[in-house]
């Protein structure tokens, strides 16, 4: 074969290879596919499920000594940060996705962080070009739009990861009245000294502003009291998620030996039954009378009314441009820039997922305090190692009123909490100017209760 012929053949082979590579790199899911199927193809082609799952599909070079170590480190970090298993199942089943999953996927695509270059340079076609990004981001937007019922958001903010709080949630007013009475009733405790409001005061931001709440007999629990305001928006209750509903949550403290210390709900019912007027009112609403189920149901119904809408930031999202300042708006942009809005999403800026504390640095080692059972977080309930130190993400509504912060309350100020999150979750140190702007944004999240700006009678001590 002549040299010229060989050269032509070689060039044809190169051109063919380049054509195949180009098609792989620019392949976009068919428009004939349903939207979820398009997204499923994108994350499959990008290799997301090779790392972000408990059963990673490792590439052949994972067995190569040097490369294998890097692969295993990347897989471990990926799975710790984001398990995409449930997202994949939801896509296949055509079910709604968790808003946190949407926010995480959206952010890495916008930032161009995933897949990493060291992956797509080996796996041609894994990278996201502009066409793929458009398909993915349109899918996120449409899915998010269908997730929220609120239609009062200004059009330009319709795709924001944060939504305004509703003015109200549908409730049975008769049950609310009973729930209000029970919420403030110390007879739910063994020694008649502690009520729900003792640790979740409605005049103290829905918390008690203490590191640990004090129960019967001067005993102290192992975590701080999360705010009761807007708790109806949490996907589960308690830091470790052991209660699926507000009613289940309401059943916990009365029987907790530290908090209210009752032996059973029969003990509570026997005390309430002595109050003839209360029993009469209760029986008018619940035909089967006093019971654990009915008591906790009434408290749940009352807690659904503990919403704090109409914050300045809510008004901004609804189109009132002068509701927040430029400095506060800059704080919100930083909040999104630093991935805060990938976990602190939705109406209450949180409460939609369990997340690991200490992604980049060991938070508990630096804390220099003895580990407790509470520090295990979700692991307490599941015994799954991945859930160790993983907690329900707290909502940030009214955050200026709810200090101290974190489950162990070792962060006294918003400034401290922001710096800690930057260090342990992102591995960075923020300049004071940026911290101040994020704090300013946080102050726009204080809402109204019963038409009045929420305040805290302890504010002078915070």
Predicted regions, residues:
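Post-cleavage N-terminal segment of exported redox proteins
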Residues: 1-35, 112, 120-177, 261-329, ...
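Aromatic- and Gly/Pro-enriched helix-to-coil junctions and flexible linker segments
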Residues: 18-154, 172-174, 178, 202, ...
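Short glycine/threonine-rich turn/loop motifs
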Residues: 23, 41, 57-86, 155-252, ...
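Charged/polar, solvent-exposed surface patches and flexible loops
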Residues: 41, 45, 69, 73, ...
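Extracellular low-complexity, Gly/Ser/Thr-rich intrinsically disordered linkers
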Residues: 398, 405-449
């Amino acid at each position: 074969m002549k040299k010229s012929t060989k050269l032509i053949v070689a060039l044809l082979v190169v051109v063919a290879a380049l054509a195949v590579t180009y098609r792989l790199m620019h392949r976009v899911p068919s428009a004939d596919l349903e939207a979820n199927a398009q997204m499923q193809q994108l994350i499959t082609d990008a290799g997301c499920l090779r790392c972000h799952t408990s059963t990673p599909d490792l590439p052949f070079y994972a067995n190569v000594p040097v490369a294998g170590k890097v692969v295993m480190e990347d897989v471990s970090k990926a799975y710790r940060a984001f398990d995409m298993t449930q997202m994949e199942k939801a896509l296949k089943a055509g079910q709604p996705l968790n808003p946190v999953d949407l926010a995480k996927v959206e952010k890495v695509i916008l930032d161009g962080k995933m897949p990493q270059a060291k992956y797509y340079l080996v796996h041609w076609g894994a990278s996201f070009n502009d066409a793929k990004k458009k398909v993915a981001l349109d899918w996120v937007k449409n899915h998010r739009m269908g997730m929220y019922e609120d239609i009062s958001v200004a059009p330009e903010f319709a795709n924001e990861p944060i939504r305004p709080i509703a003015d109200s949630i549908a409730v049975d007013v008769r049950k609310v009245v009973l729930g209000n009475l029970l919420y403030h009733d110390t007879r739910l405790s063994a020694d008649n000294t502690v009520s729900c409001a003792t640790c979740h005061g409605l005049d103290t931001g829905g918390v008690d502003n203490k590191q640990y709440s004090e129960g019967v007999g001067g005993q102290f629990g192992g975590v701080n009291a999360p705010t009761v305001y807007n708790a109806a928006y949490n996907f589960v209750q308690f830091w470790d998620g052991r209660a699926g509903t507000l009613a289940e949550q309401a059943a916990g403290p009365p029987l907790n030996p530290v908090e209210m210390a009752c032996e059973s709900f029969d003990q509570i019912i026997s005390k309430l039954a002595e109050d003839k007027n209360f029993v009469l009112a209760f029986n008018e609403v619940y035909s089967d009378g006093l019971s654990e189920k009915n008591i906790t149901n009434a408290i749940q119904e009352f807690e659904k009314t503990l919403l704090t809408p109409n914050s300045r930031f809510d008004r901004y999202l609804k189109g009132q441009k002068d509701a927040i300042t430029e400095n506060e708006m800059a704080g919100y942009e930083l909040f999104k820039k630093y991935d805060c809005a990938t976990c602190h999403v939705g109406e209450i800026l949180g409460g939609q997922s369990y997340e690991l504390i200490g992604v980049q640095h060991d938070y508990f080692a630096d804390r220099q305090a003895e580990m407790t059972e509470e520090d295990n977080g979700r692991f307490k309930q599941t015994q799954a190692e991945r859930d160790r130190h993983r907690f329900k993400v707290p909502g940030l509504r009214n955050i200026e009123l709810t200090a101290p912060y974190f489950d162990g309350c070792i962060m006294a100020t918003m400034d401290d909490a922001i710096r800690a999150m930057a260090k342990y979750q992102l591995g960075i140190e923020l300049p004071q100017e940026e911290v101040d702007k994020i704090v300013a944004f946080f102050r726009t999240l204080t809402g109204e209760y019963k038409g009045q700006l929420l305040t805290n009678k302890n504010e002078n001590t915070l």
